[in-house]
């Protein structure tokens, strides 16, 4: 008779198993995801702040450098997907001239596997998306929450998809796309595209992939970091979220450049069903290449995820063939920069002496262009969704003379707006706007850059008052009205304002805007906005209209010292 086997206590088995090394399952599969978002026409390398490259040794990004890094990773690693989360369009002269053809050409060369539609892909209307991009790319473009109707439904059918199943290293991976449902307020998609709620549209598409036995699913889209996190939490079956739109920088450890991380990379969201879902973005402007490693078990569950954005600095060489191609395409840009956009029949005063002290007609022209660029008709209750513009006087760097036929070229505008920023859309409470206008004149008379030029706003200052109490009157143009009129600013009301990205990020001391903004959507390149407005108008003649006034007691405050000096100089001359 065999002796009975001694029973080992459960607690001892658990303790021993905890001490044993945890080897990954034999069927575990690893995927490398390379990703970009919000590149905004930065085909050439740029300076560290994404403006024009002035010192090549300090410059970053560009498609020639991106190509080098992507090719290196593809050679070294077996299972690689290269994805873009939208907004390749808009941002530099490249898009102004080529209107998306350059995007299709260089994205094809880079070998992207899929792209989600961003809001800026609609900036030139649906035709400006179909012909340059959708008909020319060699990879799928995705969005599950955009639905076409009417005649457009047939025209655009099959040119973009809700999802795509890709084969990678013997496995299948599903990609579902999404686009900000606010695109009709941010761009020009027309009336025959409906932008549905992202989560409601994604869930049935993910469910469909699940019925096809696709158990590894990436949500790729362009709705901002907050929506990315909600999708990770709410959409059952999504394993990874690759996002864009909010230009979010995530990083684990010490960041390699000046961007401050909004969280660790990847950012882990606990889904409602308990799964841990990695969420990533890669900042913007092609400065970084997102690099995410994900390990799946045989059921498609994420076991681990790790990585970091790769800074594309000068330590990574630019591919010579791509660089030569860029230079060839650039010839047309150089010719364009000297072509006439339109004419002015008045002097466009962009001088420091004017724009940092009082209303200047160059500031009025810029603000009029910014509001015109945001003309939408989203609701019969509103004539437009935004009526207000602010621009820091220090950002206006040059006048344009009406003499010599008053010709305005891209080069002229580059002298006026040399910093290569964007004109963005934010939502602010009235109380924040009031603080901004107090900041505008808190050290008035010192030729500082924070003095605001405006559109859709009437402001009256009394410079004799103490700083931070100098705004006497502040009125804003209504939007929910059939006949626009100026109404007193309400402190608790939320307003939409178009402004330079520099101000949205707290530049010139406008920290209250950065800290208190309720929403921030990136916009179009500053020069492009003004150039397109001038081209549309053909002839411009902006006036000084009384948008900015000073109370009678302080009207001559800025020039008072000069008046006194002139008086005493005259006395000396008379008595010599």
Swiss-Prot record:
It is found in: Cell membrane. Belongs to the 5'-nucleotidase family. Catalyzes the hydrolysis of nucleotide monophosphates, releasing inorganic phosphate and the corresponding nucleoside. Hydrolyzes IMP. Shows a preference for ribonucleotide monophosphates over their equivalent deoxyribose forms. Although AMP is the preferred substrate can also hydrolyze UMP, GMP, CMP, dAMP, dCMP, dTMP, NAD and NMN. A lipid is attached at residue 551 (GPI-anchor amidated serine). Glycans are attached at residues 55, 313, 335, 405. Gene3D superfamilies: 3.60.21.10, 5'-Nucleotidase, C-terminal domain. IMP binds at residues 356, 392, 397, 419, 502, 508. Homodimer. Residues 552-576 form a propeptide. This is 5'-nucleotidase. Residues 1-28 form the signal peptide. GO terms for molecular function: 5'-deoxynucleotidase activity; 5'-nucleotidase activity; GMP 5'-nucleotidase activity; identical protein binding; IMP 5'-nucleotidase activity; nucleotide binding; thymidylate 5'-phosphatase activity; zinc ion binding. It is an enzyme of class 3 (hydrolase). It catalyses: a ribonucleoside 5'-phosphate + H2O = a ribonucleoside + phosphate; a 2'-deoxyribonucleoside 5'-phosphate + H2O = a 2'-deoxyribonucleoside + phosphate; dTMP + H2O = thymidine + phosphate; CMP + H2O = cytidine + phosphate. Keywords: Cell membrane, Disulfide bond, Glycoprotein, GPI-anchor, Hydrolase, Lipoprotein, Membrane, Metal-binding, Nucleotide-binding, Signal, Zinc. Disulfide bonds join 53-59, 355-360, 367-389, 478-481. InterPro entries: 5'-Nucleotdase_C, 5'-Nucleotdase_C_sf, 5'-Nucleotdase_CS, 5_nucleotidase/apyrase, Calcineurin-like_PHP_ApaH, Metallo-depent_PP-like. Its cofactor is Zn(2+). GO terms for biological process: adenosine biosynthetic process; ADP catabolic process; AMP catabolic process; ATP metabolic process; calcium ion homeostasis; inhibition of non-skeletal tissue mineralization; leukocyte cell-cell adhesion; negative regulation of inflammatory response. PANTHER family: 5'-NUCLEOTIDASE, 5'-NUCLEOTIDASE-RELATED. Zn(2+) 1 binds at residues 38, 40, 87. AMP binds at residues 356, 392, 397, 419, 502, 508. It comes from Mus musculus (Mouse). Its EC number is 3.1.3.35, 3.1.3.5, 3.1.3.89, 3.1.3.91. It comes from the Eukaryota. It holds the Pfam family Metallophos. The record marks 120, 123 as: Transition state stabilizer.
């Amino acid at each position: 008779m065999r002796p009975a086997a001694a029973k080992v206590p459960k607690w001892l088995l658990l303790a021993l198993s905890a001490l044993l090394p945890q080897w990954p399952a034999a069927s575990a599969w690893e995927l490398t995801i390379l990703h970009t978002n919000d590149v905004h026409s930065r085909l050439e390398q740029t300076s560290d702040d994404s403006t024009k490259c002035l010192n090549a040794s300090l410059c970053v990004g560009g498609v020639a450098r991106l190509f080098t890094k992507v090719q290196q990773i593809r050679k070294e690693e077996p299972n690689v997907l290269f994805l873009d989360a939208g907004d390749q369009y808009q941002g530099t002269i490249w898009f102004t001239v080529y209107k998306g053809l350059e995007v299709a050409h260089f994205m094809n060369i880079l070998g992207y596997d899929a792209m989600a539609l961003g809001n800026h892909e609609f900036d030139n209307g649906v035709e400006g998306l179909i012909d340059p991009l959708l008909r020319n790319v060699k990879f799928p473009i995705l969005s599950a929450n955009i639905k076409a109707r009417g005649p457009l439904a047939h025209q655009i059918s099959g040119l973009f998809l809700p999802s795509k199943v890709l084969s990678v290293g013997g496995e299948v991976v599903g990609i579902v796309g999404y686009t900000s449902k606010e695109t009709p307020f941010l761009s020009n998609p027309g009336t025959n595209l409906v932008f549905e709620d992202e989560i409601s549209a994604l869930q049935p598409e993910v469910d469909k992939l699940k019925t096809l036995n696709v158990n590894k699913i990436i949500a790729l889209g362009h709705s901002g970091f907050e929506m990315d996190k909600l999708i990770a939490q709410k959409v059952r079956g999504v394993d990874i979220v690759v996002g864009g739109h909010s230009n979010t920088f995530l990083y684990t450890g010490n960041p390699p450049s000046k961007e401050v991380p909004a969280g660790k990379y990847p950012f882990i969201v606990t889904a409602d069903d308990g799964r841990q879902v990695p969420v990533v973005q890669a900042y913007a402007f092609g400065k970084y290449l997102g690099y995410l490693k994900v390990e799946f078990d045989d059921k498609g569950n994420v076991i681990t995820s790790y990585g970091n954005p790769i800074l594309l600095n000068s330590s990574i060489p630019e591919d010579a063939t791509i660089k030569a191609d860029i230079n060839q395409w650039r010839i047309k840009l150089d010719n364009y920069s000297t072509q006439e956009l339109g004419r002015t029949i008045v002097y466009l005063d962009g001088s420091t002496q004017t724009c940092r002290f009082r209303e200047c007609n160059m500031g009025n022209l810029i603000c009029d262009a910014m509001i015109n660029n945001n003309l939408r008709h989203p609701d019969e209750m509103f004539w437009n969704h935004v009526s207000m513009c602010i621009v820091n006087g220090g950002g206006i760097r040059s006048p344009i003379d009406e003499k010599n036929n008053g010709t305005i070229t891209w080069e002229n505008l580059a002298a006026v707006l040399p910093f290569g920023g964007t004109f963005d859309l934010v939502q602010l409470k009235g109380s924040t706007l009031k603080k901004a206008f107090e900041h505008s004149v808190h050290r008035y008379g010192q030729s500082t850059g924070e003095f605001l030029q405006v559109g859709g706003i009437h402001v009256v200052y009394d410079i004799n008052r103490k700083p931070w109490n100098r705004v006497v009157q502040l009125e804003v143009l209504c939007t929910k009205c059939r006949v626009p009129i100026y109404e007193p600013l309400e402190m608790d009301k939320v307003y939409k304002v178009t402004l330079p990205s520099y101000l949205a990020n707290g530049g010139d001391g406008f920290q209250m805007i950065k800290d208190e903004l309720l929403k921030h959507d990136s916009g179009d390149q500053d020069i492009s906005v003004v150039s397109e407005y001038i081209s549309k108008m053909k002839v411009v003649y902006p006036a000084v209209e009384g948008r900015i006034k000073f109370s009678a007691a302080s009207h001559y405050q800025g020039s008072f010292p000069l008046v006194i000096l002139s008086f005493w100089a005259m006395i000396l001359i008379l008595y010599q």
